[in-house]
Amino acid sequence: MNNPAQFADQPFNKRIEGMGDLAEGVFEGWCGVNYVRYGLNRPPLAMWKLPLRIRHTPDYLTSDYLVEVQGFGRKQIVQMKLDKWKSLLWWDRNVMPVRLFLHDSHNDRQLMFPIKKLRPLIDNAEVRKFPEGNEYYALSAGEVWSLLG
């Protein structure tokens, strides 16, 4: 039997194929307020050419806040890219409050909270790299749920 590579170990062109679809679908069913799609969803653009703040526009807009959706699974690691973290904090400070919606597909649980509440874990997180070299904070799902759940 052929074991597919873990998500973080797959090349970017494979990761992007379904990136966020499951978690975003769960958010849309879970969210109890009106929302509209706001951020870029795999556009046919050279994303690397776009400014980071545009590239990392939060996924959804509500009347009171923006929402960034992120999923994770079996490894129980929330992988927050360093540049995405900085961009989301900019949106939170300068445009509108940002909430992070996390979907744990392995344990079928969800959590939404103001993005800045993640800072204590970010400040102590291990930095790892995706195969193409992009760095991310590796956050233990258990620690996130203990702190914010």
Question: Language-model segments: which ranges?
Answer:
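Nucleic-acid nuclease catalytic cores
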Residues: 89-118
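Acidic-basic catalytic patches of nuclease active cores, encompassing PD-(D/E)XK
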Residues: 1-49
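Conserved catalytic cores of phosphodiester-cleaving nucleases, focusing on short active-site segments
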Residues: 58-74
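A structural signal for short, well-ordered beta-strand segments and their strand-loop junctions
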Residues: 39, 66-68, 99-103
